[in-house]
Amino acid sequence: MNTQQLAKLRSIVPEMRRVRHIHFVGIGGAGMGGIAEVLANEGYQISGSDLAPNPVTQQLMNLGATIYFNHRPENVRDASVVVVSSAISADNPEIVAAHEARIPVIRRAEMLAELMRFRHGIAIAGTHGKTTTTAMVSSIYAEAGLDPTFVNGGLVKAAGVHARLGHGRYLIAEADESDASFLHLQPMVAIVTNIEADHMDTYQGDFENLKQTFINFLHNLPFYGRAVMCVDDPVIRELLPRVGRQTTTYGFSEDADVRVEDYQQIGPQGHFTLLRQDKEPMRVTLNAPGRHNALNAAAAVAVATEEGIDDEAILRALESFQGTGRRFDFLGEFPLEPVNGKSGTAMLVDDYGHHPTEVDATIKAARAGWPDKNLVMLFQPHRFTRTRDLYDDFANVLTQVDTLLMLEVYPAGEAPIPGADSRSLCRTIRGRGKIDPILVPDPAQVAEMLAPVLTGNDLILVQGAGNIGKIARSLAEIKLKPQTPEEAQHD
């Protein structure tokens, strides 16, 4: 970036010129790392800490950031401001040290709000679909030559990054409701994909509180802003009269302003028509499977249409859409002869979905695109509280696959809850008489326990939000083949 470009960008947030050094606690998270990446590209000195290296920290180090793989008071020395992830507790030694040194400590969303303050902000919120919809909006705006800045919670595969600094006036960002911090944002346009009971500890277990928080988020829009909302979602339909802003609805529903019609899935692609008010019907080929992704695309098209983006640019972006990391992410198709001696192949797909609605959407997309495949799922429940609160929903959804292997619950810092563990969930599913789930007590045993259930015409879904993504990549690297002790030691 040349000096003139940097000066222009730094002038966007003039008061932040006083800030030189920004330190992130929990910098390895996708949302944190994305903001750090944008700020690094704006010329700020970036440092951060996390417990282990990952692709996010490597990308930031490539940009010149200093990363500590520990949490120590001296890490915040000389920082102008400390940005914290919602996963970081208040007694973290870096946060304590920052308070003692009178260094401002702010949440991730507060920093995102500052980036958005002097740009045309587009924020994407909702229980499910935020990451993919953010990537679709970003792809359309980039295809239209608008050079947006984007900050996403997942890897935008076409760009190879979670975030990118553009020179245009638009900032497109995923808005996180998990800790209610999206209330810091003041966008010009807000998408809400759906609203379900999740992260209920933030909302004192009160769903009405969660719904009101979404309304408060939408009230951050100026009176001339716009809310784009999925009318198929019953909670959104209920809340529409309370929004108090200009709205555009989308969905399969007949009364949607942007309506999805004639949906058909062929392999990994969706084909459908979008009907828009005062516009010609748009026949879409979307390079992403599932009806849920057609809805995500409809939201992106609604925003782009309102902005006056040319239909041809929209269609090009959707047809060439490369998706996001760990969202129905195709990792390869492998011959089974070396795995278990059988002929044929197995496809391997990695997916982040960890709520029953998300898991259900992934299963439906797999069934629609590959109806003749033996559907095998390796599932890792995420958080004991979520497993407890949505126990019956998980049991119902997971019976839809042909074979289920289940890892232990990924705790994400939570203490175990009796009856909300993987063994109990397997027992409940088995009792329903449709499938006989297999508990995998040790991640190192995954390949060994997976091999016998593969038939030679399989689609393997590796599903969950914990460390299961690493397991998926490991399975791809070894091409599903169980490793001998010598091979495992060599790896």
UniProtKB/Swiss-Prot annotation:
Assigned keywords, A-Z: ATP-binding, Cell cycle, Cell division, Cell shape, Cell wall biogenesis/degradation, Cytoplasm, Ligase, Nucleotide-binding, Peptidoglycan synthesis
The EC number(s) this enzyme carries: 6.3.2.8
GO cellular component: cytoplasm
Binding, ATP: G126, T127, H128, G129, K130, T131, T132
Matching InterPro entries: Mur-like_cat_sf (IPR036565), Mur_ligase_C (IPR004101), Mur_ligase_C_dom_sf (IPR036615), Mur_ligase_cen (IPR013221), Mur_ligase_N (IPR000713), MurCDEF_pg_biosynth (IPR050061), UDP-N-AcMur_Ala_ligase_MurC (IPR005758)
GO MF, one example: UDP-N-acetylmuramate-L-alanine ligase activity
GO process terms (BP): cell division; cell wall organization; peptidoglycan biosynthetic process; regulation of cell shape
Enzyme's top EC category: ligase
Keyword Ubl conjugation: no
Pathway(s) per entry: Cell wall biogenesis; peptidoglycan biosynthesis
First-listed, main subcellular location of the protein, grouped into a coarse class: cytoplasm
Spans traversing the lipid bilayer: none
Locations listed in the record: Cytoplasm
Catalytic activity: UDP-N-acetyl-alpha-D-muramate + L-alanine + ATP = UDP-N-acetyl-alpha-D-muramoyl-L-alanine + ADP + phosphate + H(+)
Similarity section: Belongs to the MurCDEF family.
Function: Cell wall formation.
NCBIfam families cross-referenced by the UniProt entry: murC
Protein name, entry field: UDP-N-acetylmuramate--L-alanine ligase
The species this protein was found in: Escherichia coli O17:K52:H18 (strain UMN026 / ExPEC)
This protein's encoding gene: murC
